[in-house]
């Protein structure tokens, strides 16, 4: 998804939303009224006016107060998604948190925040230190992979690591990348970086 012009991935956990900004390479937590703003405005694509009116009516708060909160939310969201967060004090983004804090929250809630999938055991090298010992040639199918992505998304996973063997040897690797993007995961690759993709 794109937030304020920057690519991001998110997962909604009900009481909080965790967003990963590709531009700033940081996580941030959105909760309470900010989570409602995010759902109504960003996810449901409603106008600012609609969101302010709806929240005002729902909580019996003046629209001017909700409007101020909404403006603070959008300013914080813009700063959190922006690459400039890397160059400034992350605390100024208000929403940005340390990765260790995210993992601690997810552990408390028993959420598998990250997952590793070995999509193939095929490799283009024969390293003596490798646990594989001898070559195999099995691959996940695209259908099985998509089912796994759906299940991981439902469990609350946001980060996905692909490994193998060598993941680039998988004949459907590009299909897998499209599926990962479709379901909004943050991707990490473990590769030997010798394969000509």
Pin down the residues of each PLM region:
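Conserved alpha-helical substructure of the radical SAM core
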Residues: 58, 72, 76, 90-197
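Acidic, low-complexity/disordered tracts enriched in E/D and polar residues
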Residues: 1-40
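Long, charge-rich, low-complexity alpha-helical segments
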Residues: 26-115
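Detector for Asparagine
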Residues: 4, 22, 45-46, 89, ...
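Preference for short coil/turn "hinge" residues that link or interrupt alpha-helices
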Residues: 3, 21-23, 54, 133, ...
């Amino acid at each position: 998804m794109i937030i304020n012009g920057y690519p991001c991935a998110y997962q909604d956990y009900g009481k909080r939303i965790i967003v990963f900004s590709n531009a700033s390479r940081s996580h941030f937590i959105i909760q309470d009224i900010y989570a409602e703003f995010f759902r109504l405005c960003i996810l449901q694509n409603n106008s600012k006016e609609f969101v302010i009116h709806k929240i005002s009516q729902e909580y019996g708060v003046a629209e001017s107060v909700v409007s101020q909160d909404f403006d603070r939310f959008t300013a914080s969201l813009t700063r959190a998604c922006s690459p400039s967060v890397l160059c400034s004090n992350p605390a100024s983004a208000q929403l940005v948190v340390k990765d260790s804090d995210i993992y601690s929250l997810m552990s408390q809630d028993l959420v598998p925040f990250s997952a590793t999938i070995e999509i193939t055991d095929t490799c283009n090298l024969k390293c003596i230190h490798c646990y594989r010992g001898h070559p195999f040639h099995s691959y996940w199918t695209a259908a099985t992979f998509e089912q796994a992505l759906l299940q991981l998304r439902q469990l609350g996973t946001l980060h996905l690591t692909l490994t193998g063997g060598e993941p680039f040897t998988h004949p459907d690797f590009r299909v897998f990348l499209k599926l990962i993007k479709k379901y909004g995961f943050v991707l990490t690759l473990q590769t030997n970086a010798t394969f000509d993709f």
